[in-house]
Each structure stands twice: as structure tokens, then as C-alpha cells.
Amino acid sequence: AAWTPQMAAGMFSLSGAQAKIAIRWEEGRWGLPYGSQATTHILKPYWDGLPGHAINEHLSLRLGARVGLAAASSEILSIGNATVISVRRYDRVVVDEQSIGRVHQEDMCQALSLPPSKKYESEGGPGIASIVNMLRRNLPVAVAQDTVTRFLQAQALAWAMAATDAHAKNYSLLLAQDAVALAPLYDVSSAAPYFVNEVRDVRPGEVSMHKAGLAMKVSKHRKFNEITAQDWKTLADQVGLHPEETVSLVAAVVQRVPSATAEVVELFNQEPGRTPSERKFADTYKTAVKRQATLALRSIEGKGIPTRRP
């Protein structure tokens, strides 16, 4: 896919940018489902324009789990000359030895009756407040409280790790009989390894740190270097949450990211079969994400100076 201005700002989820195939793992081998059989995994080969992105998503999912959030299970596979990420489908249940069942899910666009084209807030899609209000409006009180907490924790992680593509279609609700739950994290990656200190001369495979930001604003701000503790307090006020408690919740996630990133990368690099280039990208990921998380932590603690342009 061509490197567009949107991609240079970290908006990677564009038509044709990422290929994927849903397949089935059965009896120790991969295969295509037959008839009504359910798939079990999603394989994603990443295009050459974004180096290391399969490993990026794999590390990001592990990072999410490491800081205490539910995240889809994944692994890195080599198929031919391609590096791909294999993600186990969380919307599947084992019925018996011969049968795998499906769990219905709706992403946040579907839950809000919006078309897929509205996944980015900047393009008319929902923001954090819209999603929180929808959850509180439609779920039982106890379930809504837990779901909102986990959704806000996911937003805190997205900020800390520079997950620019955390839009409304990348969060879902699992619906099983009378139970509703926020789906594990999926399709999450960090733009930080691709950051460059440029505004105009951004080459393919690079992301301008000055243009990059969250897919959903925190209060009025989306750029990473503009978000402060006050923005999280304002957001809390908008949705009827306690401002100080919300900041504490966000800070608790952000504080865990630097050490969790180092742990995740260390474990990855120790895996048998990891190539020098894979380890090199993982180290780049570690340095970049730790830096981003440190900046976010300084901001939430009031030690950083936001760079807001008029």
C-alpha cells in the first residue's frame, strides 16, 4: 500500500494495508474450514512498508497482558520468507473434541449502529466518552462499572505505548447468552518504533511524532505530547466519573509499562529460533515504548510540559 499522510500520522488500518486470513488449527496442522466449521486463528503477513510490524503486534499484545489487561494470544511464525503473526481467536469455545463454537461479538461501531467507515473519531466515529456512555446506558450497573474500568485502562495503555490505531473497531463486546464482557485486546501495535522528528519529510515506514496521537481524544486532545492529567480529569467529568480516581487508574497502568516492556522483550529475545533482525527490532521496540511511557508518566504526574500548538 502507498504511504499516505494518514499512515505518516500512525493511521495504519486502511483498506488494503494489512492482509489477513482466517484459518483453522486442527490435529497439529493448519487448514481451511469446511462448510460451517469455525476458524480458530487469524494469520497476518505484514507488508514491507512497515518493518517488523508482525513482531510489533505480538509484543504489544504481550505487553497488554503483562500490565494486567486481557489480550489475545499470539505467536510469531515463519512461513516461507515471510514473518507472520498468528492470533488465536478469543471468540471461539471448544464444544467437544470435534466441534468449536462461535461467540458473538460486536465492535464499538456496531454497538453504536455506526458503519465501519466511522471507526476513527476524526472521521466522524465515536470517542471515549461516547463509548463509555453507551456501556453505562446498556449494561447492568456492576458489569458496566467493570467494563468501563477496563476500557479506560486500555486507553491508558494506548497512550503510554503510542498505539495510534486504537479506534472503535479495535474494541469489541463479547455477547454470550445473558453475559456481556469487553473482548480482550486485539489489533494493537505501537507507532513509537517508527517515530521520527519530522513534520513534512516523512518517508515510507516512518511516523511523525508531531502528528501522531490517539485514535480517540482524551478530552480535547489526541496528540501524545499534548495530553495531560487535566485532560483525563475533564474526560472523567464528561462521563460522570471521579476525576482523581480516573487519573489514578490511568497512572497505575502507565507506571507499569516501562518495566513490563523490558520483561516482554527479554522473554521474546530468549525464545529459541529468534533471528538477529527480530531481536534488533524487539530492542528498538523496547527503547521506543519505554521512552513514550516515560513521557506519558511525566505528563500525568505534572512534570512534563505539553507542547500544544495554537
Question: What annotation goes with each model-predicted range?
Answer:
Residues A1-A168, S172-P310:
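Anionic ligand-binding catalytic core segments
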